[in-house]
């Protein structure tokens, strides 16, 4: 796994985490993990870019997953002031994960990660690195068969009854973030989302090598095959491997939302996947899908409650940086959306397209406009400028959430983090309109623990914040 070289992380005033590296330097690292800033030679970079605030690192076009938070200036004394540096981490992760995949080197490996032109000149239908991670159904929907090794494309129980899965081809089996095979819909996030073309949004959850291999367990000891629920119970203090100070990438989860492309869509503005979509009868239909939402969760040694980043396509809903027409909003003020949504389906049961009503979605929790010198909105504009005419300039970071007071897992004897463990920032409102559509308000999200990544996932702390493992282990 390619990674940017990490350095030790230090707490700053018990509120902030930062590295001991030079915060004025680009995040490049050594060896093949390095990268460079884009140049005019790429033909992809926009013109004038806004000036960087003091101490803010220069964006880097690199296929190496960042493994540390760049050092914060001494003037940064609050989580809000630290936000730009965590947003930088999120954007660098987004670039690395969406780097073209090297399909000749197994799964989860970027192609020439130190060569920016590979990324800047890639087609918008090129398979990306995170897209070759193992999908949830490859891990938890294989009956009594043990899941295949990480690099294998073979599964004991294929998702499609009528079509083999080609190497690297996506198969969408989920109609909500909470379920895995589409008829399993008892989870909290199980109600589907319908776009303006009356098509269901499809979801996938993927695990990188470190996390997948931990859940699958070592070949030498079947008692450690943690996908078995009995073993999960016995391992009450299960910890996923974390990215360490040597730069070895630890556990990383990706959750993605996709919508079906139609004649009205400008498909050049989306990451595309020519995929198989699972139907209720078990058959699959070839469909061109476009990426509309992406959650990234990465565990670092000094952030045991993980760092949570969420991105969306700029044409999802109205708001700063948005581009009409919208995929999940009709552009009108009606129907009203006091909690961020209207026309929510009554049931998880899928119905024919003619019976569906498009879900009206608005962003209840705005993309942060603070701190004034380098807000999340500003960081988005910065990276969109660096990404120029690539497809990635059509995406935006919605929010980054992290523990401001990281707490070691070992502090809790039963392997359970308490609520609000790590003092997350922001506390509330860290939501994605495509993944937490119906949980944007604190009222709607109360039963799930709260309307943010960390508030929700602390309930799965027994499985080290992995709802997929906690719910789907069998």
Annotate each predicted stretch with a short phrase.
Residues 17-20:
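C-terminal motif of bacterial Sec signal peptides marking the signal peptidase cleavage site
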Residues 25-29, 33-455, 460-474:
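Conserved small-residue
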Residues 1-10:
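Bacterial N-terminal signal peptides that target proteins for export
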């Amino acid at each position: 796994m390619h990674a940017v070289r990490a350095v030790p992380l230090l707490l700053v005033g018990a509120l902030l985490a930062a590295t001991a590296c030079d915060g004025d330097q680009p995040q490049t690292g050594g060896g093949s993990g390095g990268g460079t800033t884009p140049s005019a030679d790429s033909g992809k970079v926009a013109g004038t870019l806004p000036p960087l605030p003091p101490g803010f690192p220069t964006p880097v076009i690199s296929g190496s997953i960042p493994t540390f938070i760049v050092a914060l200036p001494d003037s940064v004394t609050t989580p809000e002031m630290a936000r730009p540096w965590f947003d930088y981490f999120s954007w660098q992760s987004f670039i690395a994960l969406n780097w073209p995949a090297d399909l000749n080197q197994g799964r989860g490996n970027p192609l020439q990660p130190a060569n920016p032109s590979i990324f800047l000149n890639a087609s918008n239908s090129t398979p990306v690195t995170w897209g070759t991670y193992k999908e949830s159904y490859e891990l938890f929907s294989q009956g009594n068969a043990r899941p295949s090794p990480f690099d294998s494309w073979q599964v004991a129980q294929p998702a499609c009854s009528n079509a083999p899965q080609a190497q690297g081809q996506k198969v969408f089996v989920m109609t909500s973030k909470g379920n895995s095979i589409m008829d399993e819909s008892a989870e909290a996030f199980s109600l589907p989302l319908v776009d303006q073309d009356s098509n269901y949004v499809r979801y996938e959850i993927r695990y990188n090598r470190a996390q997948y291999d931990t859940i699958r367990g070592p070949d030498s000891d079947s008692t450690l095959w943690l996908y078995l629920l009995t073993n999960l119970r016995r391992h009450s203090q299960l910890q996923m491997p974390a990215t360490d100070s040597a730069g070895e990438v630890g556990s990383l989860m990706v959750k993605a939302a996709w919508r079906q492309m139609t004649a009205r869509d400008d498909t050049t503005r989306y990451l595309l996947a020519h995929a198989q979509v699972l139907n209720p009868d078990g058959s699959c239909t070839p469909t061109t899908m476009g990426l509309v939402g992406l959650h990234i969760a990465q565990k670092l040694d000094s952030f045991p409650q993980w760092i949570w980043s969420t991105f969306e396509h700029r044409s999802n809903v109205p708001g700063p940086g948005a581009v009409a027409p919208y995929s999940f909003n009709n552009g009108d003020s009606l129907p009203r959306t006091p909690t961020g949504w209207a026309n929510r389906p009554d049931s998880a049961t899928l119905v024919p397209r003619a019976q569906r009503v498009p879900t009206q979605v608005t962003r209840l929790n705005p993309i942060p406009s603070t701190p004034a010198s380098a807000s999340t909105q500003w960081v988005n504009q910065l990276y969109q400028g660096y990404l120029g005419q690539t497809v990635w300039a059509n995406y935006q970071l919605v929010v980054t959430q992290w523990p401001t007071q990281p707490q070691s897992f070992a502090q809790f004897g039963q392997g359970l983090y308490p609520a609000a463990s790590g003092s997350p920032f922001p506390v509330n409102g860290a939501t994605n309109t495509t993944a937490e559509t119906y949980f944007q308000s604190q009222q709607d999200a109360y039963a799930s623990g709260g309307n943010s990544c960390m508030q929700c996932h602390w309930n799965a702390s027994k499985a080290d914040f992995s709802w997929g493992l906690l719910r789907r282990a069998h």
